């Protein structure tokens, strides 16, 4: 699996992920890029699950963003509908974390679109470790969103065997 974490704080939203791709109990690749920018750099998206499945979902999600002029929530709801009802998409096993300047969402293959509390998303096998670390840092420090995401990924990578220390981090400034 993997670890993807997204943190929203004050003037930025950050999303990061590790780079490990596993096949069973074998590490196949250590520098995969599981977090990327979409829709002219205005949206950050990350995936946990099958790599091929994630690329399909990224393409579908970006098409929905184009169709709905970058409206993140609308695009997420439409992707979730397609994912739940389309026979081919239903077989895909992945979770998407998406964020823009206004919202952070988790999209699942069950048709769920979830806006988490405190602007904190953590998915994948290392998600619970990253979430615990990020929540503690959010509540007890003044660190920025990207510093919290980086540290949460580091901690998850130390604990989860399916998460490595090769990280990708994307940051979107939030302007008032």
Swiss-Prot record:
Regulation: Allosterically activated by HslU binding.
Residues at which Na(+) binds: 157, 160, 163
Compartment list: Cytoplasm
Catalytic class of the enzyme: hydrolase
Catalytic activity annotation: ATP-dependent cleavage of peptide bonds with broad specificity
Domain of life per record: Bacteria
Keywords: Allosteric enzyme, Cytoplasm, Hydrolase, Metal-binding, Protease, Sodium, Threonine protease
Biological processes annotated in GO: proteolysis involved in protein catabolic process
Assigned GO CC terms: HslUV protease complex; proteasome core complex
Record: active site: 2
EC number(s) recorded for this UniProt protein: 3.4.25.2
Transmembrane regions listed in the UniProt entry: none
Main location as per UniProt: cytoplasm
InterPro entries tied to this protein: ATP-dep_Prtase_HsIV_su, Ntn_hydrolases_N, Proteasome_sua/b, Proteasome_suB-type
GO molecular function list: metal ion binding; threonine-type endopeptidase activity
A UniProt-annotated Pfam family: Proteasome
PROSITE patterns: PROTEASOME_BETA_2
Family per similarity comment: Belongs to the peptidase T1B family. HslV subfamily.
Subunit structure: A double ring-shaped homohexamer of HslV is capped on each side by a ring-shaped HslU homohexamer. The assembly of the HslU/HslV complex is dependent on binding of ATP.
Functional summary from the UniProt entry: Protease subunit of a proteasome-like degradation complex believed to be a general protein degrading machinery.
Name of this chain's protein: ATP-dependent protease subunit HslV
Organism for this UniProt entry: Marinobacter nauticus (strain ATCC 700491 / DSM 11845 / VT8) (Marinobacter aquaeolei)
